[in-house]
Amino acid sequence: MKHLLLTTIAAVLLVGTVFADPIHDAVNRGDLAGVQAELDKGANVNAKMWRRTPLHSATAGGHTEIAELLIDNGADVNANEDYGWTPLHLAAKYGHREVAELLIAKGADVNAKKKDGWTPLHLAALYGHTEIVELLITNGADVNAKTEEGATPLHEAAGWGHKEIVELLIARGVDVNAKNDLSFTPLDWAASVDEEDPPETKAAKREISDFLRKHGGKTGAELKALMPRLVQHGRFAFSFDAKEGKIYEVQDSFDLLNWETIRIYTGAGDTVRFDEDRDHDPPQWFYRVKMVE
């Protein structure tokens, strides 16, 4: 009997806390009056259930009025669940423009990153939500943000056949030849057609490939072939062969991650030679040259 009583008490405690939080239940039902009632009782507006706050749930469900009520009562617009999802990530994923506008107006970070580096813009580009892509960019979203695997929003839009978003990103100055960690560009992703893709997706990706080409897009292999070979002569003397009329940037780095352009040359069909013996803090150990036009 004692064991049964303890088990029953434990079950009641669980029902009243993590597994059945009344404010979460009201949010998930889309019950505005129910949410207000729980707030009037003193419910914790940032209480988490299954890693999410009530605002996460309101955003995922597209419940704009509930989201506004929660924010007005102290909900954290930039709250993270365990994997780094913020409410704005969810609005971007599910295409809830009104909620996204509300969150941004209330101070949501448009460049917040999940643990894998994904921003709201990556998700909007992946799922084809053009209006949200435009909203995010207008409010300062980084069009060249990269995930942990090096993918940009343009990779996602190109790879999933969202031509309008590709056009929008390029119009906003995205790097058309950004490479991910496997050295694939957005053009590589657009050109990669899955046999299971529906006909309209295949057609869209062909159009995207042509559009990227018209705007200077190249595959990773093509970019590698265009990369001039930088030859080192002694410690600080370098040279490379430059094609006539092409523009080259010489860059240096101390960690192979952060590169800075230190010289720009216009090729004349000959060998460019230069010395680089400036003092650096921190010291620069790596140099490269890339053709930009």
Locate each region found by the language model.
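Ankyrin repeat boundary/linker residues
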Residues: 48-49, 81, 114, 147, ...
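Short, composition-biased motifs enriched in small/polar/acidic residues
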Residues: 221-293
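Conserved ankyrin/ankyrin-like repeat signature
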Residues: 34, 65-66, 98-99, 131-132, ...
